[in-house]
């Protein structure tokens, strides 16, 4: 554990005066002592004051607002008493699960609602008592506008990842949602970065908020950052070298576009490593399944876009690889924050090319950190978990177990910061099929790239093997499946015309 979560005042959860049932849920979930952000925010939230909290990724921000919300909710009142807004569907599912886990002894009903799911199901669920609603802004505004979700008596308005929710795309929706709440509501904002838009929102909609800033530096101390300078066509070869050398519990590989996500996932699968992929254009059910399986350790590697950069907490992830280098410091900060969760160690490796050199300089300047060139040897103690039992087991049907046993990273390099491997590099774009035959979605595994094709079906009895079509004419000799279609057709025509000739001869020679 590093100082980001251990540098506390020495308080215990019992010191906050929480309900006994809530304390039972907290301790059963594995919490021992509150983190710094929880020590600062829980007492202030319990007295009903607005909060503007800024803390690093992976330091316990979710529990910092869920615990006081659960404490203040009255289960006997069948009204929505807390609204938690998040920017992504996966984060909504994760936050709702935290609410259910911590409050399982309180008799509190938690509902999660996001876009991409049936509106009818949400309407039916809101007919029953719901105390906490977790969701994305657009869907909740839709429910409130249809007068299905009654927010007129909802005293708590919480925004996680507030910097994203107060961007240009979400701000109009947030402003409309606030009109459904009472004027004496309690507003709490939590995030790792606070742009100027957050200050404008707090001045307009918050009453003397209590400001918490635990960001003496932006990046987590437990995350070691390196970059490797490679050409674009050598990135996959470089990634293969990293997989074979690093001791990876679970890894997340980020790309800048959805097309590259799917193509890279296909390449990783061809290299023999278990791999899932996820991006915003996938069906919601498929995204949920991928997120659930990866979180449970079904697979070691996940390729994704910036969809999973915010709030996703998978503590088994110890390596983050930026296959495509991000364009700004905010995206970079949230990407590498997927490793090193809650005081654990993590490793961030960035594959950069000539066009990324200015972005690298700008990110180092904005974050006040230095990204080192990758050394020839990376010490395991910088990123390997101390407790091996917490490491999820990957699937083993794609590659023998030995391929996943990585040693210390010892990479021959001809120049500092350049990662080289043995053997000729493979072109990244050289395997695109000329005419892809898509697999039906209902029979396709979730991690199977959509351009994977079925093997060609063998010839069936009664089908000509050359043209894969039924032989239309009966023919003597072997079965139609054993002879060319043209041969069968020729024999059949000769017999036909022979028979017709005999009929015509009889007809002509017969007397009138």
Swiss-Prot record:
Keyword Lipid metabolism: no
Reactions it catalyzes: ATP + H2O = ADP + phosphate + H(+)
GO molecular function list: ATP binding; ATP hydrolysis activity; RNA binding; RNA helicase activity
Keywords: ATP-binding, Cytoplasm, Helicase, Hydrolase, mRNA processing, mRNA transport, Nucleotide-binding, RNA-binding, Translation regulation, Transport
Motif DEAD box boundaries: 160-163
Gene3D superfamilies per UniProt: P-loop containing nucleotide triphosphate hydrolases
Family matches, as InterPro entries: DEAD/DEAH_box_helicase_dom (IPR011545), Helicase_ATP-bd (IPR014001), Helicase_C-like (IPR001650), P-loop_NTPase (IPR027417), RNA-helicase_DEAD-box_CS (IPR000629), RNA_helicase_DEAD_Q_motif (IPR014014)
GO BP annotations, alphabetical order: mRNA processing; mRNA transport; regulation of translation
GO CC, alphabetical: P-body
Enzyme Commission no: 3.6.4.13
UniProt motif Q motif: location: 11-39
Domain Helicase C-terminal: from-to ranges: 222-382
Cell compartments where the protein resides: Cytoplasm, P-body
Residues binding ATP, per UniProt: 55-62
Helicase ATP-binding domain span: 42-212
Domain notes: The Q motif is unique to and characteristic of the DEAD box family of RNA helicases and controls ATP binding and hydrolysis.
Role, per record: ATP-dependent RNA helicase involved in mRNA turnover, and more specifically in mRNA decapping. Is involved in G1/S DNA-damage checkpoint recovery, probably through the regulation of the translational status of a subset of mRNAs. May also have a role in translation and mRNA nuclear export.
Family of this protein: Belongs to the DEAD box helicase family. DDX6/DHH1 subfamily.
Name the record gives this protein: ATP-dependent RNA helicase DHH1
Organism expressing this protein natively: Chaetomium globosum (strain ATCC 6205 / CBS 148.51 / DSM 1962 / NBRC 6347 / NRRL 1970) (Soil fungus)
Gene label: DHH1
